Amino acid sequence: MMRAGGLLKLGVLVSVLFVAVFLAFELLESNMNFNLGKVFTRYAPPDAVPTRPLRHKCGLSKSCPEDHFAFKITSGAASVVGPKMCFQDNVIMSGVKNNIGRGINIALLNGKTGELTKTDSFDMWTGDVNLLIKFLKDIEDGSIVMMATFDDPATKMNDEARNLIADLGSSSISILGFRDNWVFVGGKGIKTKSPFEQHIKNNAETNKYEGWPEVLEMEGCIPIKHD
């Protein structure tokens, strides 16, 4: 009986020792895998490390060619949210910058350097259209002209002002009406109509907001003026 009891104790001791050794090896292997994982992650080649999505200037969907300026322009939303203009990754007009107003908002930039030269807004509901006309006449040749509407852009607009804007490359200025939304990028001295223009009519049946159409957003790449 004593011999049998001793053998039983010995068997239990061997089993416990075996389990302890097994667990020790398991723990060691787990630590080695963890450490090796850290090492391989640290020294992984660049293409194996996740990267952030590439961001383009002004949040454009793709980068502009090297000899172009990037821009994005958004019209106002009803009479609540004003327009926003971005040029070469710099916001040049917005509500936050406090340089926008009801009517037509305009930014002028140097066509060679991209330097912002002037911004202004003209109230076309109760304002004086002659102020807009003078501003348009004073634009220097070679200037990039960005325009965006807010609230009402057309009540005070007359033929002289429309013709001056058409000379900047606009195709839609002749039909711009009460509370229409419109965004445009043209230039002083342009020889053709600008490809950068969007216009949406104020229509009670299709308006997104009560009394106003939906917001317009336009982006693009403007060739740098070299001559």
From Swiss-Prot:
One of its GO terms (cellular component) is extracellular space. It is found in: Secreted. Residues 1-30 form the signal peptide. PROSITE patterns: GG_LECTIN (PS52031). It holds the Pfam family ILEI. CDD domains: ILEI_FAM3C. Residues 67-225 form the GG-type lectin domain. Keywords: Developmental protein, Disulfide bond, Lectin, Secreted, Signal. Its main location: secreted. The keyword Ligase does not apply. InterPro entries: FAM3, ILEI/PANDER_dom, ILEI_FAM3C. GO terms for molecular function: carbohydrate binding. Disulfide bonds join C58-C86, C64-C221. Belongs to the FAM3 family. Involved in retinal laminar formation. PANTHER family: UNCHARACTERIZED FAM3. This is Protein FAM3C. It comes from Danio rerio. The gene is fam3c.
